Amino acid sequence: MRALYPGSFDPLTLGHLDLIERGCALFGEVVVAVLSNPAKTSTFTLQQRFNQIHVATAHCKGVSVICFEGLTVSCARHNQVDLILRGLRAMSDFEYELQIAHTNRSLAPDFETIFLATAAHHSFLSSSMVKEVARFGGNIDHMVPEVVAQDLHRLFN
């Protein structure tokens, strides 16, 4: 099976990476789809985020990284995946993700969304929180892959 894991990944956290690894173990293949959203201001460019994920997942058999703009279900169809993978850290994530899953299902009834609970030791992580810690000089080495930590240190130091 092939799973699509879409997101902005600005930046990729160890929580994201854990979900990618677990997705590979469960489904065999994970297509990490990096969202280009012109309406959002990103810390890292689309190419930087693509490169960070490519480097951070080099050890994962069955992972491919792509960039996309537009609807997730269009990306899923175009890349011939079987399901959409999403992570849940808390109940607040569930409410938001459930709305998106229902919307995707209304647009493309043939795609299921599978939710995986984030590992407890990563449940506090968010990309925005990581950037905040990095911006003020805090240690982020236990929050993000090494390639991302290096890029954040360069950006904020």
UniProtKB/Swiss-Prot annotation:
ATP binds at residues 8-9, 16, 87-89, 97, 122-128. Homohexamer. Reversibly transfers an adenylyl group from ATP to 4'-phosphopantetheine, yielding dephospho-CoA (dPCoA) and pyrophosphate. The record marks 16 as: Transition state stabilizer. Its main location: cytoplasm. Its cofactor is Mg(2+). It comes from Prochlorococcus marinus (strain MIT 9313). It catalyses: (R)-4'-phosphopantetheine + ATP + H(+) = 3'-dephospho-CoA + diphosphate. The keyword ATP-binding applies. This is Phosphopantetheine adenylyltransferase. Its EC number is 2.7.7.3. Substrate binds at residues 8, 40, 72, 86. It comes from the Bacteria. Belongs to the bacterial CoaD family. Pathway: Cofactor biosynthesis; coenzyme A biosynthesis; CoA from (R)-pantothenate: step 4/5. HAMAP family: PPAT_bact. GO terms for cellular component: cytoplasm. PANTHER family: PHOSPHOPANTETHEINE ADENYLYLTRANSFERASE. Transmembrane segments: none annotated.
